[in-house]
């Protein structure tokens, strides 16, 4: 149905955005830990 083709890209974008945010947070945490050493 047409609804799927509309909602699917939104779900993909949301997943991508959340993964990107999580990755940036991990990098930030790693840099913070490195700055403590």
UniProtKB/Swiss-Prot annotation:
PROSITE patterns, per database record: CRF
Localization: Secreted
A GO term from the CC aspect: extracellular region
Keywords: Hormone, Secreted
InterPro entries in the cross-refs: Corticotropin-releasing_fac_CS, CRF
Coarse class of the protein's main subcellular location: secreted
Molecular function GO terms recorded: hormone activity
Note: Inhibited by antidiuretic factor A.
Task of the protein: Stimulates fluid secretion by the Malpighian tubules. Increases cyclic AMP production.
Family recorded in the similarity comment: Belongs to the sauvagine/corticotropin-releasing factor/urotensin I family.
Protein name: Diuretic hormone 1
Organism: Tenebrio molitor (Yellow mealworm beetle)
């Amino acid at each position: 149905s047409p609804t799927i083709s509309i909602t699917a890209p939104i779900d993909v974008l949301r997943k991508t955005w959340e993964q990107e945010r999580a990755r940036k947070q991990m990098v930030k945490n790693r840099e913070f830990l490195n700055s403590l050493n």
